[in-house]
Structures are given as C-alpha cells and as structure tokens.
C-alpha cells in the first residue's frame, strides 16, 4: 500500500474482532476504530457470497466514516449441504435471538443422515481505501475439517466444538489459542491481507 493510513474503521460491532484487528495493525502505527464511533447504521447483507457481503460492509463503513475500512464475512460450509449454512451461519436457526446452541443443533440434525461430513470454515476480509475504491483488497482463508456429531472442547464459540480437525485429532474448541491463531480461517485471511497491504 503506497500511503499508509493512520486510521481504519472496522465494519463490525464485535468487540473480539476489534481487539484482534487492533492488535494486528498496532505494530504498523495504524489505529483500528469501531464503526460505532461514527454511528454507522447496520449494513444490509443481501448477497449470497461472503465476498459480496464483506465488500458491501466495507464500502458502507468507508462511506459513513470517510476513512479506509475493513470488513469480514465468515461462516461454516458443509459439503453435503451444498455449502450451507454459509453466509447464514450466525443466524442459521433464526435470529431472535442468535444462538450458537440452536445453530449447532440444526446443523447436526441436517448432517445426521449424510455420509459426507466434510466441512470448512471460510473467512473473507475486504479492505477499501474509500467507498468507491475500484481496487478493493480481498483476502480469503479456508480451514478444512469434519463435522463431529459429539461436541468437545471449551476454547471456542460458534461451531467450534463440532468442527473436528483430523490432523490434530481434536475439535477447534479443543485447540489451544496459539495453534488456532496460526491455522484458523481468520488467521489465514489475516496473513494474506497483510501480504497484500504490503505494510
């Protein structure tokens, strides 16, 4: 990136993501601000792909803040369900209220009779310099695993207790944070984003 921004707005209200991205950019002298600081209204996510929704959120945040913006969209995709839950992962069992337990039970029921238990976590990050940026920077991470019918582990959220990694012999929720922060879909996308930003 030829001109390094001093500030970036994160198109999310998630405190965990704000901390993660804040820590990532801090060594480069870049401050990551939450979109709540600019009273940015929630962005509609009408698209059927992670990248289109992340791009919409990034442009929305940049347009309202006047700053470069970073957005992510992520979820889990089951091969036997043609990629579902996909972009609907967070609200798979409904959104009133969102519930990890309900989402997991719904996906477990849908995969119960399927022979193919392969699934993957996907994270797409989009960075725009301004709302009309014709060259958004897009990074993607994919973490391959298997759906495990029995949950295990406490170090995670979402679908982590059911997301089994044969190479580790553990679910994502059983991995320690150091391994997770190195191998996860989000870690892969962040590494690619940093390479593309060339900070």
UniProtKB/Swiss-Prot annotation:
E.C. designation(s): 3.6.1.66
A GO molecular-function descriptor: ITP diphosphatase activity
Pfam families: Ham1p_like
Reaction equation(s) it catalyzes: XTP + H2O = XMP + diphosphate + H(+); dITP + H2O = dIMP + diphosphate + H(+); ITP + H2O = IMP + diphosphate + H(+)
Swiss-Prot/TrEMBL cofactor(s): Mg(2+)
Keyword Transport: no
Note on cofactor: Binds 1 Mg(2+) ion per subunit.
Active-site residues annotated for this sequence: 73 (proton acceptor)
One annotated GO biological process: purine nucleoside triphosphate catabolic process
Matches recorded under NCBIfam families: RdgB/HAM1 family non-canonical purine NTP pyrophosphatase
Known role: Pyrophosphatase that catalyzes the hydrolysis of nucleoside triphosphates to their monophosphate derivatives, with a high preference for the non-canonical purine nucleotides XTP (xanthosine triphosphate), dITP (deoxyinosine triphosphate) and ITP. Seems to function as a house-cleaning enzyme that removes non-canonical purine nucleotides from the nucleotide pool, thus preventing their incorporation into DNA/RNA and avoiding chromosomal lesions.
Protein name: dITP/XTP pyrophosphatase
Source organism (scientific name): Neisseria meningitidis serogroup A / serotype 4A (strain DSM 15465 / Z2491)
């Amino acid at each position: 990136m030829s001109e390094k921004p001093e500030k970036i707005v994160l198109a999310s209200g998630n405190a965990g993501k704000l901390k993660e991205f804040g820590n990532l950019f801090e060594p480069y002298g870049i401050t990551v601000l939450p979109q709540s600081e600019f009273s940015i209204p929630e962005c509609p996510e009408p698209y059927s792909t992670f990248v289109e929704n992340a791009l919409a959120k990034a442009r929305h945040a940049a347009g309202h803040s006047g700053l470069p913006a970073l957005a992510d969209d992520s979820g889990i995709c089951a091969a036997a369900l043609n990629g579902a839950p996909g972009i609907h992962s967070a609200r798979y069992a409904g959104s009133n209220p969102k519930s990890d337990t309900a989402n997991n039970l719904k996906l477990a029921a849908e995969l119960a009779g399927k022979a193919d238990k392969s699934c993957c976590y996907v994270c797409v990050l989009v960075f725009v310099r301004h709302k009309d940026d014709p060259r958004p920077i897009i990074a993607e991470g994919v973490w391959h695993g298997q759906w495990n019918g029995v949950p295990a582990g406490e170090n995670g959220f979402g679908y982590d207790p059911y997301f089994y990694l044969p190479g580790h012999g553990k679910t994502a929720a059983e991995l320690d944070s150091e391994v997770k922060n190195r191998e996860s879909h989000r870690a892969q996308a962040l590494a690619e984003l940093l390479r593309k930003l060339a900070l």
